[in-house]
């Protein structure tokens, strides 16, 4: 995938990003042979899906970003490749958390913090400016399990499908941006 062709990425260090993406793909291939971390077939499409939100939302003021159910790193890892924010990834699966820790070391990402626990069990020391999650669970239960990380200024950015409209019943302050079948939902 040629990232320089996308206007919304022009203000980022794409050479560094592409180097880290290469390391990510190699590491994922190694881990996947043994641990079967993900069934995704087109990694490039999923990387693009992870960073496309930068076309819709300005992350520049976010100091702490929490990602819930990080799995193989989509979307948080790729945002961490581009942004200076501190990323706090919550992934209770030991194999996936080990992959993320290895990736942090291999890509030299001091802004990436991995927690091998469920977010609702975390004894927080920070409040997140942004909480992200990609297709983990319905909106309302997600809001509930994240209550220890949020305050009145926290923004949720969710990667969802077309079902998002039903999930937002009785929720008032949100925006949805569409890209193909993806719905990027921003809850304020």
UniProtKB/Swiss-Prot annotation:
Protein name: Ribosomal RNA small subunit methyltransferase G
Protein task: Specifically methylates the N7 position of guanine in position 527 of 16S rRNA.
Swiss-Prot/TrEMBL catalytic activity: guanosine(527) in 16S rRNA + S-adenosyl-L-methionine = N(7)-methylguanosine(527) in 16S rRNA + S-adenosyl-L-homocysteine
Subcellular localization, as worded in the UniProt entry: Cytoplasm
UniProt source species: Campylobacter jejuni subsp. jejuni serotype O:23/36 (strain 81-176)
SUPFAM superfamilies for the chain: S-adenosyl-L-methionine-dependent methyltransferases (SSF53335)
EC number: 2.1.1.170
Gene Ontology CC: cytosol
UniProt cross-references to PANTHER family, sorted A to Z: S-ADENOSYL-L-METHIONINE-DEPENDENT METHYLTRANSFERASES SUPERFAMILY PROTEIN (PTHR31760:SF0)
Recorded coiled-coil stretches: none
Pfam families (UniProt xref): GidB
Keyword vocabulary terms for this entry: Cytoplasm, Methyltransferase, rRNA processing, S-adenosyl-L-methionine, Transferase
CDD domains: AdoMet_MTases
Binding residues annotated for S-adenosyl-L-methionine, in chain numbering: 69, 74, 119-120, 134
Gene Ontology molecular function terms on file: rRNA (guanine-N7-)-methyltransferase activity
Membership in a protein family: Belongs to the methyltransferase superfamily. RNA methyltransferase RsmG family.
């Amino acid at each position: 995938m040629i990232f320089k062709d996308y206007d919304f990425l022009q203000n980022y260090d794409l050479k560094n990003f592409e180097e880290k993406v290469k390391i990510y793909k190699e590491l994922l291939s190694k881990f996947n042979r043994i641990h079967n971390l993900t069934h995704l077939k087109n990694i490039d499409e999923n990387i693009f899906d992870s960073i496309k939100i930068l076309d819709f939302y300005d992350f520049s003021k976010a100091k702490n970003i929490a990602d819930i159910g990080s799995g193989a790193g989509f979307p948080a890892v790729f945002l961490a490749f581009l942004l200076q924010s501190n990323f706090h990834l919550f992934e209770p699966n030991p194999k996936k958390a080990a992959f993320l820790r290895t990736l942090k070391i291999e890509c030299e990402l001091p802004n990436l913090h991995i927690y091998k626990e469920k977010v609702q069990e975390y004894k927080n020391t920070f409040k997140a400016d942004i909480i992200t999650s990609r297709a983990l669970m319905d909106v309302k239960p997600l809001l509930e399990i994240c209550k220890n990380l949020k305050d009145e200024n926290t923004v949720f950015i969710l990667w969802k499908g077309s079902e998002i409209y039903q999930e937002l019943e009785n929720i008032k302050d949100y925006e949805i941006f569409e890209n193909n079948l993806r719905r990027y939902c921003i809850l304020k």
